[in-house]
Amino acid sequence: LERTSQGWLNRAAELGVANPSRYDTCAWADFDHDGSVDLFVNGTVGGGGHYRDWLMRREGDINFIDVTPTEILERNASHGATWVDYDLDGDLDLALAGSAIDGTHALLENLLRPEFAWHSLQVRVLDEKGHSTRPGSEVRLFVSGTDRLLGTRRVDSGSGYDAQSDLPVHFGVPGGQKVDVEITVPGGGRRSVTRIDGVDPRMYQGRSLEVRTDHR
């Protein structure tokens, strides 16, 4: 649903995500580091059947295409899904949980080529004491020295069904270029903004950029 001046517009069909099915959860992430967010949708189990899962890659500005690998289709996972760089190689991996009688909990490693895997930046938003108490904060990345927006993420600690989001927000950074980071923390009737300019993603391989923000 896209919010317009006339109300809400359903664009699912034209974007290629209007798949007739039943789902438990979805998870957005730029798993290929092209600068656009991609979509994983987890099919539910019910009525004696299992609805298939979908991994949809964003192509250009207006299309998603189905790139679901057999490794996902064979798992028949449902319910939980979250993206996380568990092996700290720069790209996002996918953790899945299910409701089958014999149990399913798959951890799928993203095998993005190393030269592209490190075209990324993870940002962990902290409070003034260094604690992760800033859910709801907005993180924006700009091409360094410009107002060209590369992406926006929200610090999310609770989304997902049978899953919890990883607290660092993850950005694909095409070309691994330097970026300016802007963090907005809402609370107490105001919006506090913190900026760090000229961040080189290569300096944060295998770790997150940790940013302490002002008191709300």
Name these PLM-found stretches.
Residues L1-R11, G49-D66, D102-W118:
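Beta-propeller blade repeat segments, especially FG-GAP/WD-type strand-to-loop junctions
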Residues S5, A13-G16, F31, V45, ...:
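Disulfide-stabilized cysteine-rich extracellular repeat microdomains
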Residues L9-R22, I65-N76, G130-H131:
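Short loop/turn motifs that recur once per blade in beta-propeller domains
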Residues R22-T25, Y51, A77-H79, G103:
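Beta-rich catalytic cores
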Residues Y23-H33, H79-L88:
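Beta-propeller blade termini
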Residues H33-N42, D89-A97:
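Acidic/hydrophobic-patterned starts of short beta strands in beta-sheet-rich repeat architectures
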Residues N42-G49:
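Short, conserved, GDST-rich strand-edge loop motifs in beta-rich repeat architectures
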Residues N63, P69-E74, T82, L88-R216:
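Gly/Ser/Thr/Pro-enriched helix-cap/hinge segments flanking short amphipathic alpha-helices
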